[in-house]
Regions:
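Short glycine/serine/threonine-rich phosphate/pyrophosphate-binding segments
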Residues: 132-138
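Short, well-ordered secondary-structure micro-motifs
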Residues: 59-61, 110-112, 138
Length: 138
């Protein structure tokens, strides 16, 4: 069984004026990222949207000292970017589509991702997303 982990493809990481944007480089992959995500969903494979989430006044989170505010809960910056947003809205009620709020670089840190993958007997994990030196790497 296989799964796709879609990591941090949000306005703050991709939009031209996003807080920590990859800008044009992130925007270039939109069509391919959306297409592969749709293919995984429609094939019945497990698709996880692992999305960075921060609180504006979280003085204890180490990222607040490293980076400007980004992916803040309740802001446009945290919304999925471009045509990935309507794709998620179209399929979000399917049992093979799962959303994880992550507070750390790793989608495994402080989440139930490991158990979700194990209970589905996932053997092949595919990664897509932006900020590959941080968000995808970890």
């Amino acid at each position: 069984m296989k799964a796709l982990l879609s990591i941090d493809y949000t306005w703050d990481f991709v939009a031209t004026k996003g807080a920590l944007t990859t800008a044009e480089e992130g925007q270039k992959i939109e069509t391919a990222l959306v297409q592969v995500t749709k293919e995984f969903i429609e094939a019945g494979d497990f698709v996880v949207f692992a999305i960075d989430r921060h609180e504006k006044e979280d003085a204890f989170h180490p990222e607040n000292k490293l980076f400007p505010p980004h992916n803040l809960a309740g802001t446009t910056g945290r919304e999925l970017f471009g045509s990935l947003a309507p794709l998620y809205e179209q399929y979000k009620e399917k049992t093979n589509v799962y959303w994880i709020d992550k507070r750390h670089y790793s989608a495994f840190s402080g989440t139930d991702l490991d158990i979700r993958l194990r209970e589905r007997h996932i053997t092949d994990l595919y990664l897509t997303g932006v900020c590959t030196d941080i968000c995808v790497l970890h």
